[in-house]
């Protein structure tokens, strides 16, 4: 199983082997990768764009990642600080918790906009802050979806060998 997750080509081939179930399996994988994070989300999003085209790839990867983000937030909220601190040092989590609400909103939004930042963990850690679930949903959705759009577009460009999409 790990060899499949470690190779984009193997992952793509495995997904395609599910035939008409490929979109559902992809959706579940993308959701799970946010919550349990065995592979970077950028890899699965590129594969989604390559498999399904930029539009369907964006819809599948973005909606699955949002669901995973909300589940990770819920896990952080339900299981609390001791659980979250298993994945990051105590000081980092304490700093996040100490941010005032307006600063926390801006900080989370900025982190979600930064490509390559471990925003899956941010979703988990946000569960131990004072932010409400509703507010988290808005910030996460607005902050994360642009990145999923661009990465799905790149994945679709790879399949079409489109230099404009690849240049993005």
Question: Which residue ranges define each predicted feature?
Answer:
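Transmembrane helix boundary and interhelical junction motifs in multipass membrane proteins
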Residues: 30-56, 115-123, 144-148
